[in-house]
Swiss-Prot record:
PANTHER family: UBIQUITIN CARBOXYL-TERMINAL HYDROLASE (PTHR24006), UBIQUITIN CARBOXYL-TERMINAL HYDROLASE 36 (PTHR24006:SF758)
Active site: C185, H443
Pro residues bias (residue ranges): 781-790
A UniProt-annotated Pfam family: UCH
Modified residues (Phosphoserine): S518, S522, S673, S675, S749, S783, S789, S847
Enzyme class: hydrolase
Gene Ontology cellular component list: cytosol; nucleolus
Stated name of the protein: Ubiquitin carboxyl-terminal hydrolase 36
GO MF terms, alphabetically ordered: cysteine-type deubiquitinase activity; K63-linked deubiquitinase activity
Length: 1091
């Protein structure tokens, strides 16, 4: 509203008052601000204006709409005044008379500074990053509301804070203890923690000049800064424990509700103590009450402990972001859902959702749902952290929180273009611990660091050194971390900006081990969350614990030094990036252990490459292996590392490996092992860890060379189009068992064709034949009637033997005595499909095999077998004959009496379901009779033919026939009553309901307990006919009501009650039910008459 309208209407009144005041000569009295009564000077200017004030206020002001206030009103006012050119003051004072803060910028001298740190042109002073260059903006711009405002005045520059013990000129001692004056452990521990903060201690020592000229103590008041400085000096100069009387005698002045001798909270005392020191520092300034909040936050305590949080509230409707800044001096971390300090920081700075429709958006102008997130806009020099261990009810959360002596808060800093690249590293300097179970009781101690870097425990007057491991395992309550000055990249730059005044976040450099050196420029790095060793699905870049996802350039020659090789291949090409959730891939990533010196765990995942489209993937362990050069391996080999032959050339085609294992290995890894490097087998191929599908996806080569890695063969080439598919080992066994009979019929013809088609002993389905035994001739294959040895499958649940349920075993085993026990057999090593180990694939009948050769069991993925060598069964298989007929027959039988029928692998009923019970018992006894004392079967094979029970030779006649009879009776008893079997299995027996029904609704009534108690009471057949002790019927009814499950314990055999009980017993013994006994008056009267 234009004020000139009202002024113009009252011009005459004001002019008359001025003339009268000047004429009388009392103008000075009218200009003074002293309060005078109306009767002293009625002719004063003040009295004239007050008298006409009512008239001025009652004057009607008419409003007019103008298009522009600047042109309509201000231009008219300018014509009535003379504009005098202002002169810039040379002392740098602003309009309020306060000294302007130039923040160390000499170019800003002589400028009037506004409220937000701007000059007259509206340009921020912080926009001059270089002191020697002043980039002027002719147009100027207003303050950015999304940036932290600048204070008009800085009471204590941030650059004057000295960080670290080395910044001081004096020699710092460990410090003496403090005497407990009576429940003052909270005070002693807090003071010790503050005195061992280098920044605060250096500032207190620098206040020596203030202590000499301090006039607060002379006036009878209290200066807490002087008291803290004197107490610190006493702990440094005194060898014995000191008494901090300067602090606890003035406890009422620090906090009004604190009482000496009463237990208090250490964090509460800390906050009141810091606030009292800030007030004492502000009292040094004459107009400290008129200072705004931003200026009050520039005290030395605010510069040391103070920081700013950036709060971003994002509207979920219009995505409007509201940014505010909040000053803090400590961070209160919630540890209820955290186990470490890093997790607590993650939860504090994570994005949280506000209450639904509880935030009024500035853009939508309505209440909407929003999210809120904190960021570090300006990190403090000393970070104070309080763990929320106490609740409002006084209970304490005593969980252990793990923390480190150094923490990095760079990822929580607010990102800005002018951010510094130096990391935000803090180191632990002191802490306060609490021993106790609640807030109302316990003991406080302190831990502080010294100039030498060691830590000491301060328990009141006791001071003792403590190891860093013990420090990290303490039950911390308050922790003080100080900014590490050694982590600054440039001391001059750190000094200029006050050690991260902007606290921005830039790219964090990744530490590379010294063993890797390359003259080429480093590839582009991925800035973001880093993966742990192993990564996704076993990917690892071999850089130790610091795993960074990197992107490879398209062409980069390889460089090798100290046994660590960098990748030089082209980047991985893929049309789509897929994370397969197959069981084999999950097991591979779960148990893949990282190895040292550049040896990584292998991951065999299929890669579908596309030349037209390029997609960058993280560097994996397979990509670091060169295809053209041999990687130099260290001489030391771990058990989980494959032994590579350094002298082999990977460019030459490899011949089949025919070196057998000298000693049978017993592995503790299941068959589907996550790592193929468990067995220490000398391998000549250094590129054996390449993916099996690399060559199949590329151009097909005519050579069919194969390389075996720890018993697993890998195909580098293929002759047919359909032979390159991987077949799972378990599916291969299942389908080979189903088609076993069909393969035996065409054995002779297909065997000859197989020898001609495979010159390099490489089968098209991925099975690789091994060295044959001497007893086998190439011209004459072994008899197809030789039963195969049971295949062993090792899984996570244990070892399983595969048995077949075909009817040809009984016929084929008749002439088994004429056959040689140890025959040559083709070792079939499957090429595992890591995308899906249980995926369906081609059966074994698709490829020509040698059906005359026996199938060798797949144990631990190893397919190595020599002549007359016992099988390594991992402790679960007896080293008997190769056919294993006894164990095979025992495993085919099911436990009928204990559980449901066990089906065979192909889903058919076992032999026990089809054969007579007598024949099974005979075969079982015959099998036990053929075993020697060591538990291994003899050379005489037990075949599966139908043997009459009379033709079996038993060790002892009476014992064997009794065993048959007992087994037959047991089987009849099992099939007789199904309910009894259910009782044997531990299930609850169902109560039979006969003539009587259970009609008792009493809670907790148990008919079984009542029946058992009845038998126990009358086990002697009843006692003598004792008379009734209680003749009162009403009392007897109450007694029976209280003792519901008790009967007449003293009635004779001839009493009616006893006869009634015996009848109930006979009824229950016959399987009938019963109801609860209802006492009647007629029965009791009859019993009393008989007595």
């Amino acid at each position: 509203m234009p004020v000139s309208v009202a002024v113009c209407e009252t011009t005459n009144v004001v002019n008359a008052a001025l003339r009268e005041s000047l004429g009388v000569g009392i103008g000075s009295g009218g200009a003074s601000s002293d309060d005078k009564s109306a009767g002293e000077d009625t002719n004063s200017l003040q009295n004239h204006i007050v008298a006409n004030a009512k008239r001025i206020l009652m004057t009607k002001i008419e409003y007019e709409e103008v298009p522009n206030y600047q042109e309509a009103v201000l231009e008219n006012l300018k014509s009535k005044y003379i504009v005098i050119k202002p002169t810039n003051p040379t002392n740098g004072c602003n309009l309020n008379g306060n000294t302007a803060n130039t923040f160390g910028n000499k170019n800003n001298a002589g400028k009037i500074v506004g409220a937000n740190g701007h000059d007259n042109n509206g340009r921020k002073l912080s926009d001059h990053p270089n002191q020697n260059h002043n980039h002027a903006n002719p147009n100027g711009h207003h303050a950015n509301p999304n940036e932290l405002p600048k204070p008009k005045r800085v009471l204590y520059p941030r650059e004057n804070i000295r960080i670290g013990w080395k910044q001081s000129e004096r020699k710092w001692q460990v410090g003496s203890g403090m005497i407990n004056a009576g429940n003052t452990c909270y005070l002693n521990s807090t003071l010790q923690a503050l005195f061992h903060i280098p920044a605060l201690a250096n500032w207190l020592v620098s206040e020596q000049a203030h202590m000499e000229n301090c006039n607060v103590s002379e006036s009878g008041s209290f200066c807490i800064i002087c008291a803290m400085a004197k107490t610190l000096q006493a702990t440094q100069t005194t060898q014995s424990a000191v008494r901090p009387f300067l602090i606890y005698t003035k406890l009422k002045q620090i906090c009004k509700h604190m009482i000496v001798g009463r237990q208090e909270d250490a964090h509460e005392f800390l906050r009141f103590l810091v606030e009292a020191m800030e007030r004492a520092y502000l009292m040094r300034f004459r107009n400290y009450k008129e200072l705004d909040q931003l200026v009050k936050e520039t005290t030395p305590l605010g510069q040391i402990f103070g920081g700013y949080l950036r709060s971003e509230v994002r509207c979920l409707s219009c995505n409007h972001v509201s940014i505010t800044f909040q000053h803090f001096q400590d961070l209160l971390l919630d540890i209820r859902k955290s186990d470490s300090l890093e997790e607590a920081f993650e939860g504090y700075f994570s994005r949280e959702k506000l209450e639904d429709f509880g935030y009024k958006c500035e853009g939508c102008k309505k209440k909407v749902s929003a999210t809120k997130q904190f960021r570090l806009e300006r990190a403090p020099i000393t970070l104070c952290i309080q763990l929320k261990r106490f609740s409002m009810m006084g209970n304490k959360l005593t969980k252990q929180i793990t923390f480190k002596p150094r923490i990095d808060l760079s990822k929580f800093a607010a990102r800005s273009p002018a951010a510094s690249v130096q990391p935000l590293i803090y180191r632990l300097v002191s802490m306060v611990t609490h021993l106790g179970v609640s807030q109302h009781c316990g003991h406080y101690t302190a831990i502080g660091s010294t100039e030498a870097g060691s830590y000491y425990n301060f328990d009141d007057s006791y001071v003792r050194p403590i190891a860093i491991q013990s420090v990290c395992n303490t039950n911390a309550y308050i922790m003080f971390y100080e900014l590490d000055p050694l982590q600054t990249s440039s001391p001059a730059a750190a000094r200029a900006n006050g050690l991260r005044l902007t606290n921005g976040h830039g790219p964090v450099p990744v530490a590379v081990p010294a063993t890797v050196s390359s003259p080429l420029p480093s590839p582009a790095k991925f800035i973001g969350p880093q993966l742990p060793p192993g990564g996704i699905n076993g990917y690892s870049n071999g850089h130790g614990p610091k795993t960074t996802i990197q992107f490879k350039p398209q062409h980069q020659p390889s460089h090798q030094q100290n046994g660590v090789q960098q990748s030089a291949k082209s980047p991985l090409l893929s049309t789509h990036v897929k994370v397969e959730a197959a069981a084999g891939a999950a097991a591979l990533a779960a148990s893949a252990a990282p190895t040292a010196n550049g040896n990584k765990s292998s991951s065999n995942h299929s890669n579908h490459k596309s030349v037209n489209q390029q997609h960058y993937l993280p560097i994996s362990s397979e990509d670091e292996d060169s295809e053209d050069e041999v990687k130099a391996r260290p001489t030391v080999q771990l058990p989980s590392m494959p032994k590579m032959d350094d002298c082999m050339d990977s460019g030459k085609p490899k011949s089949p490996v025919k070196t057998p294992v000298k000693t049978p290995l017993k592995s503790l890894v299941p068959y589907e092992s996550a790592s193929e490097e468990e067995e220490v087998v000398p391998l000549p191929n250094p590129n054996a860890r390449k993916r099996s599908s690399d060559s199949s996806d590329s151009e097909h080569e005519p050579t069919t060379s194969s390389v075996q890695l720890n018993g697993h063969s890998k195909t580098n080439g293929s002759l047919s189009n359909g032979s390159s598919k991987s077949t799972d080992a378990i599916d291969e066994i299942f389908k080979s068992l189903k088609g076993y009979q069909a393969k035996k019929k065409s054995a002779d013809s297909e065997d000859d064709d197989d020898d001609e088609d495979e010159p390099n002993n490489q089968l098209t389905n991925g099975w690789h034949p091994q060295k044959q035994s001497q007893s086998q001739s190439r011209s004459g294959p072994p008899s197809p009637k030789t039963p195969p040895s049971p295949a062993v499958i090792k899984s996570k649940t244990g070892i399983w033997k595969v048995t077949r349920d075909d009817g040809d075993d009984d016929e084929d085993d008749d002439d088994d005595d004429d056959e040689v026990v140890e025959e040559a057999r083709a070792v079939r090593t499957p090429v595992k499909n890591h995308r899906n180990p249980f995926a369906s694939s081609k059966t074994a009948t698709d490829s020509p095999t040698t059906p005359g050769a026996k199938r060798q069991k797949l144990l631990n993925g190893s397919a190595i077998k020599t002549q007359q060598q016992p099988r390594a069964g991992n402790g679960y298989q007896s080293e008997a004959t190769a056919n294993g007929g006894t164990v095979n027959e025992l495993l085919k039988q099911s436990h009928r009496g204990y559980s449901s029928s066990v089906l065979s692998w192909n889903g058919k009923p076992a032999e026990l379901e089809k054969e007579p019970f007598v024949l099974v018992c005979a075969k079982r006894i015959a099998g036990h009779g053929s075993l020697d004392g060591s538990g291994s079967g003899s050379n005489t094979d037990i075949i599966d033919t139908e043997i009459p029970a009379a033709a079996v030779n038993f060790p002892s006649g009476s014992c064997s026939f009794s065993l048959l009879a007992d087994a037959r009776d047991q089987r009849q008893r099992d099939l007789a009553d199904d309910e009894e079997n259910e009782m044997d299995r531990g299930r609850q027996r169902k109560v039979k309901s006969g003539s009587a029904k259970i009609s008792n609704s009493t809670p907790g009534y148990n008919p079984f307990m009542e029946f058992e108690n009845q038998k126990r009471w009358h086990k002697n057949g009843g006692g003598g006919g004792f008379p009734r002790f209680y003749q009162n019927q009403n009392f007897r009814q109450g007694f029976q009501q209280r003792n519901k499950f008790k009967f007449n314990r003293f009635g004779g055999p001839g009493s009616a009650k006893f006869q009634q009980q015996r009848a109930l017993q006979r009824h229950l013994a016959a399987g009938g039910g019963f109801t609860r006994r209802q006492p009647t008056h007629s029965a009791q009267q009859q019993q009393q008459q008989q007595s």
